[in-house]
């Protein structure tokens, strides 16, 4: 039986998904990667096993760029062990944390405040928690998506930000970490453990939003998670 030729955008995206799934590293944005992320995020000594909040969050909050967090609704994308979800809750926010790593979420759920709800889901394919949200934050999920799925991410995630709300993101920095080009990734299916983005990349990808802050993460801020190989950006929704 001859399969139908590609004739829709969804079919094209799904075909490209198959290329990524066939690579040795696999598709780390797919639910099948739950075990990988659970092991990585609980590995003793791994930088991501920290309980510290991201440096940009603390900085933006002190500068008043996040708005009032007391009573705010927050969506924490790729929440992992819940360190940023916990920080938001400590500021008075009601938090929806989402991540692929169901075993990890089951382990950390009892340790988090009651105002944090954790849900295991695929940000690209599963229904997202009902918005709108005052703050949507992504610490390291976006840079693991295959290039063609950035389109899906933008179409699904940005509408969850309320008008006047905030969207914040942290990614690998293009000038600090090596990564393949999008063409190389699409050709080989290998996402190489994550992709890098320049500040201009972030500005362009999230064009529907208004930028408030684009900069490298400040590695000198104490009591925060602040590796020197990350870029960060904060936007507001019109």
What are these regions, as identified by a protein language model?
Residues 128-136:
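A short acidic, Gly/Pro-enriched loop at the edge of an enzyme's catalytic core
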Residues 138-139, 170:
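Short beta-strands and strand-loop turn motifs
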